[in-house]
């Protein structure tokens, strides 16, 4: 079995951001030489996530508003009693989840017509990483 592990690095300019990363993942899959297998894409932080959905600006805004409604910024969270101020970021990351696994078929990501991979940042303006691990034959 072939494997390849690479890391994507992020430092967003805003507190919350949604970054389309399908092209970067495609490049890593191509570099791996894997024809049949899978790729794991995982945020290595507890205030960020990875998800698959449409790359449509209205939908991205809807996702952001929905998450903000469910876990508002600056609410009085118990987590803040520890001196932190990012309780909402942890909750938003739980809703998005931290990883996806995408099949590789004939050397390409086997995504649906409108499916794209995104990095979701909920506590930005600092260095963060995403691991991309390709496995297969």
Indicate residue ranges for each PLM-predicted region:
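Active-site histidine-anchored catalytic micro-motif
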Residues: 1-137
